[in-house]
């Protein structure tokens, strides 16, 4: 007789090999055909909303690994919230204006932007932006990200631009928009002002020079201390040699001690506490202090500029520190924020001798036409000729660069439009406190940034963007902006988009009959556009407030930690300025992606990993699993080795799912499910372990701690299931009659585990869960066409049975000692497979009573026979002794013959005439099966 045919061997068409790169696109196609996004919305329609507002990625180039991680995290959250019963729409967006797209348009046209009309240039920019959106959209969808991909929000859409104009108008109405001459970050390469969020810092080697300014007027305070002023100098230090021609003052700290120190024949004035440092760095001779003054006592003195016949005023400033330099700060109001502010207090000119392209103008005699970096060498030579260069060295320091072209930037005073953060700073700081920040340090970080930030320079000297909606009187030059002009611009932008600004005259845009206070009716348009951070920072108004599926404020903003100074902040500022509160309730940040050694990814290191390559080789689900494999609030490491580890972890989860499916082929959940009360104790233990995972994972996900997923699910599949419960269960599943209560109890448990597990992994392993779901039989209440339409598992209180939990946890702990004893016996060649073993247990009285509470211990230990000895019975000397329990174990070869059907050794094999090669238990099971 072929006894294999009497066994309930596992069977399923669910493939062992995932083949994700091929299978995932098929699942994507199925989702699109069923319109899964709108079906999930319909399912939870009318329920409480959960809005994760998408921070728009820039529409330029392929997505990188960091962008992929960000989008996957968002998708996991939205899918989890949907399964929890929230109406959780996800409207993706794109940031579509700005310099990078202009640069691509210039490449496409093969000309300079000044050589074509703004309208023609903007059309090329728009076409390029749309091409990038379509490319990135396909890449995001391939990651398994679910969203309203057919209706994304774009910052170039007319409706969006009109709403942005409205935000600008509201801020202007409240007095928060002004035009001023101020030093701003300026990129000579891009010929435009930059916001703080557009600055990156890189190490750079620069000049480090000490320059002396001869004292011209000491206000009589040095009388009797020095013979004459011809050899008395204030000494400054700078790393920006090119700013020396713009020097108008020297700033001292009012409370610092300033020494007149004699170095040879000359007297240098500098902070007393910096003398030794300067002496060493400048390689000066020994000195003698001849007098000490407080900084405030030197205010109003005058020094002579070393290059020009003009004075440098000695002024006071609290910004002067002793961290570096001489304590005498070179002050050029046209080239520094603090220089500008302190210069305003003293009525200093805002001198800016540098043009838009970084070249000196005739305001710097002797250097006109020189590029500022090239001028460094010439200026140093002139300082030497003037005997004003005390010392020069080279220094490596962190220096600001343009985030787009990576060129060094400069501080340069120009007329720009600003948003007065000072006008609503306190409101913004208050709003920050009302938001939940994850991690919590995010609150302090953005608080410090907002508290310390300067006013926001919102104008850009470019073409591709939303124009600043301001007009100027042709006669008197006064700016014109009011409700009527804003409404007129808004209406036209809503109809025609912002191209209208470049296609229409001021007269065509403005309401009829509008006049300036001076009586003129002739106006011209502002030529600057808005900072792209104002674009994306207006999304809360342009998207959350206007989209029919969304609401304001958002429940969550989720971006990289660099967005504390970017989108989080620009959104906060525009929202507080116009609505008095933050546009989000919660803010979650993730770190950056680094390589396996923790290094930043770069072309020079060749350590970058393309998400497209990961998907092609491993599949999107592996990338999604990696996203939650570690604490993403810190920097995330990725490498081929790490991806292989993810693949192995994934395989364990998939194998567990396959085992569950393969043992449910003849199980109908509507007919064959047993009530909890009829399950075996070990089944109830398994459901307790499952329940614990549901509880812990739900708690973690609710706190945005998605990085607990891999540990919890992987441990459950590998430790609780594969290594323990499922291994023990095989005998009951395979050898018992197919419809027996014992097997149905096992299958009931497996079904609950599978149905729960597939839902738990659905937000993360979005493709694999869908594949598993399609192979499952479902009860009539849960026969959804997609797992994404199923609910998140609930914690079942009845599964938390303290008596069963404690009892079986202890037995499984003892089982570790049994396994150790079996391994020793296997090493000693006493047995091969554990089913060849008989285990004799010599317990204490307490453990004896404990073991008597179990039936069929041999199936739990996966051996053929267990003999429980009386407590007083002595164990043989060679017995294995437990370190943790009062217990000794002896392993010998089991008596009897091996059963051909169940493989256990039994003395009943050969005792049944009809079935001479199987044990009595198996014969009984076959008999019961034939009677069904």
Swiss-Prot record:
Which InterPro entries does the UniProt entry name for this protein?
A: aa-tRNA-synth_I_CS, aa-tRNA-synth_Ia, Anticodon_Ile_BEm, Ile-tRNA-ligase, Ile-tRNA-ligase_type1, Ile-tRNA_ligase, M/V/L/I-tRNA-synth_anticd-bd, Rossmann-like_a/b/a_fold
Q: Which cofactors does this gene product need? A: Zn(2+)
Q: Which cysteines are joined by disulfide bonds?
A: none
For biological process, the GO terms are: isoleucyl-tRNA aminoacylation
Segments carrying motif 'KMSKS' region: 600-604
The record's GO molecular-function terms, alphabetically, read: aminoacyl-tRNA deacylase activity; ATP binding; isoleucine-tRNA ligase activity; tRNA binding; zinc ion binding
What does the UniProt entry state concerning the protein's domains?
IleRS has two distinct active sites: one for aminoacylation and one for editing. The misactivated valine is translocated from the active site to the editing site, which sterically excludes the correctly activated isoleucine. The single editing site contains two valyl binding pockets, one specific for each substrate (Val-AMP or Val-tRNA(Ile)).
Entry coiled-coil feature ranges: none
Q: What does this protein do?
A: Catalyzes the attachment of isoleucine to tRNA(Ile). As IleRS can inadvertently accommodate and process structurally similar amino acids such as valine, to avoid such errors it has two additional distinct tRNA(Ile)-dependent editing activities. One activity is designated as 'pretransfer' editing and involves the hydrolysis of activated Val-AMP. The other activity is designated 'posttransfer' editing and involves deacylation of mischarged Val-tRNA(Ile).
GO CC annotation, single: cytosol
Supply the name of the protein.
Isoleucine--tRNA ligase
Entry binding sites for Zn(2+): 899, 902, 919, 922
| Top enzyme category | ligase
At which positions is ATP bound? 603
Q: Find motif ('HIGH' region) and give its ranges.
A: 57-67
Listed binding positions for L-isoleucyl-5'-AMP are 559
The record's subcellular location field reads: Cytoplasm
The record's similarity note reads: Belongs to the class-I aminoacyl-tRNA synthetase family. IleS type 1 subfamily.
Q: Which residues cross the membrane?
A: none
Q: Which gene encodes it?
A: ileS
EC? 6.1.1.5
Cofactor binding note of this UniProt entry: Binds 1 zinc ion per subunit.
């Amino acid at each position: 007789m072929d006894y294999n045919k009497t066994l309930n061997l596992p069977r399923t068409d669910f493939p062992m090999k995932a083949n994700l790169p091929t299978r995932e696109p098929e699942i994507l196609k199925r989702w699109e055909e069923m319109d899964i996004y709108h079906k999930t919305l319909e399912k939870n329609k009318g329920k409480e909303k959960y809005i994760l507002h998408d921070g728009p990625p820039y529409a330029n180039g392929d997505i990188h690994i960091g962008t992929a991680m960000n989008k996957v995290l968002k998708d996991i959250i939205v899918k989890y919230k949907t399964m929890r019963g929230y109406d959780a729409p996800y409207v993706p967006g794109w940031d579509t204006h700005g310099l990078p797209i202009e640069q691509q348009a210039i490449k496409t046209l093969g000309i300079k932007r000044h050589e074509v009309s703004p309208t023609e240039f903007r059309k090329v920019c728009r076409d390029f932006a749309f091409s990038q959106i379509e490319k990135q959209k396909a890449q995001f969808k391939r990651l398994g990200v679910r969203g309203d991909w057919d209706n994304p929000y774009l910052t170039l859409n007319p409706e969006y631009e009109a709403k942005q104009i409205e935000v600008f108008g509201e801020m202007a109405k409240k007095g928060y928009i002004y035009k001023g001459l101020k030093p701003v970050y300026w990129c000579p390469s891009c010929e435009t002002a930059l916001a703080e969020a557009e600055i990156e810092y890189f190490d750079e080697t620069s000049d480090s020079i000490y320059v002396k300014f001869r004292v011209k007027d000491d206000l009589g305070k040095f009388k009797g201390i020095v013979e004459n002023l011809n050899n008395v100098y204030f000494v400054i230090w700078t790393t920006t040699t090119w700013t020396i021609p713009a020097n108008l003052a020297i700033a001292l700290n009012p409370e610092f001690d300033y020494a007149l120190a004699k170095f040879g024949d000359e007297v240098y004035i500098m902070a007393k506490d910096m003398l030794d440092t300067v002496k060493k760095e400048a390689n000066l001779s020994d000195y003698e202090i001849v007098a000490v003054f407080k900084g405030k006592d030197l205010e109003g003195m005058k020094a002579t500029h070393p290059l020009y016949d003009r004075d440098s005023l000695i002024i006071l400033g609290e910004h002067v520190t002793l961290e570096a330099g001489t304590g005498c700060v070179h002050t050029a109001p046209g080239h520094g924020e603090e220089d500008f502010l302190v210069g305003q207090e003293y009525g200093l000119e805002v001198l800016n001798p540098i043009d838009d392209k970084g070249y000196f103008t005739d305001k710097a005699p002797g250097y006109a036409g020189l590029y500022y970096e090239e001028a460094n060498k010439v200026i140093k030579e002139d300082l030497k000729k003037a005997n004003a260069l005390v010392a020069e060295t080279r220094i490596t320091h962190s220096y600001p660069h343009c985030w787009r072209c990576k060129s060094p930037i400069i501080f340069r005073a120009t007329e720009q439009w600003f948003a007065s953060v000072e006008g609503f700073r306190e409101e913004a700081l208050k709003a920050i406190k009302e938001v939940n920040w994850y991690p919590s340090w995010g609150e302090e970080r953005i608080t410090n940034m907002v508290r310390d930030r300067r006013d926001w320079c919102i104008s850009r000297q470019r073409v591709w963007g939303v124009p600043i909606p301001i007009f100027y009187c042709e006669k008197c030059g006064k700016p014109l902006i009011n409700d009527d002009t804003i409404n007129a611009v808004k209406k036209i932008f809503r109809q025609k988009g912002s191209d209208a600004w470049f296609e229409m005259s001021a007269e065509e845009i403005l309401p009829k009959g509008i006049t300036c206070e001076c009586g003129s009716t002739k106006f011209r348009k502002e030529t600057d556009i808005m900072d792209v951070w104002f674009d994306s920072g207006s999304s809360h108004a342009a998207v959350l407030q206007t989209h029919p599926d969304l609401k304001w404020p958002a429940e969550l903003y989720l971006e990289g930690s660099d967005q504390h100074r970017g989108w989080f902040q620009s959104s906060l500022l525009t929202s507080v300025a116009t609505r008095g509160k933050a546009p989000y309730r919660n803010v979650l940040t993730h770190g950056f992606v680094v390589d396996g050694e923790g290094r930043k990814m770069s072309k020079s290191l060749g350590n970058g990993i393309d998400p497209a390559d990961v998907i092609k080789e491993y599949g999107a689900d592996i990338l999604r699993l990696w996203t939650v494999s570690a604490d993403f609030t810190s920097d995330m490491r990725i490498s081929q080795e790490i991806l292989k580890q993810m693949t192995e972890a994934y395989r364990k989860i998939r194998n567990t799912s396959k085992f569950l499916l393969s043992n449910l082929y003849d199980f109908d959940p509507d007919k064959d499910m047993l009530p909890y009360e009829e399950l075996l104790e070990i089944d109830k233990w398994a459901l307790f372990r499952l329940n614990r995972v549901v509880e812990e994972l739900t708690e973690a996900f609710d706190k945005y701690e998605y990085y607990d997923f891999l540990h919890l699910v992987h441990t459950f599949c590998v430790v609780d299931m594969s290594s323990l419960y499922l291994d023990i269960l095989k005998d009951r599943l395979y050898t018992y009659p197919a419809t027996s209560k014992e097997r149905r109890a096992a299958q009931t448990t497996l079904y609950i585990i599978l149905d729960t597990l597939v839902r738990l992994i659905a937000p993360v392993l979005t493709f694999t869960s869908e594949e598993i779901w399609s192979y499952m039989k479902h009860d009539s209440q849960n026969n959804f066409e997609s797992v994404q339409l199923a609910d998140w598992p609930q914690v079942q209180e009845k599964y938390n049975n303290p008596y069963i939990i404690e009892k079986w946890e202890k037995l499984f702990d003892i089982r570790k000692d049994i396994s150790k004893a079996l391994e020793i016996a296997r090493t000693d060649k006493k047995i091969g497979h554990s089913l060849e073993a008989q285990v004799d247990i010599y317990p204490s009285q307490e453990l004896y009573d404990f073991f008597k509470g179990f039936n069929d211990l041999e199936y739990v230990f996966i051996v053929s026979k267990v003999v429980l000895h009386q407590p007083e019975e002595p164990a043989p000397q060679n017995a294995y002794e437990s370190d943790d329990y009062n217990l000794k174990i002896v392993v010998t070869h089991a008596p009897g013959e091996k059963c051909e059907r169940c493989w256990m050794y039994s003395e009943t094999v050969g005792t049944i005439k009809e079935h001479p090669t199987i044990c009595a238990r198996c014969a009984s099971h076959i008999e019961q099966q034939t009677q069904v």
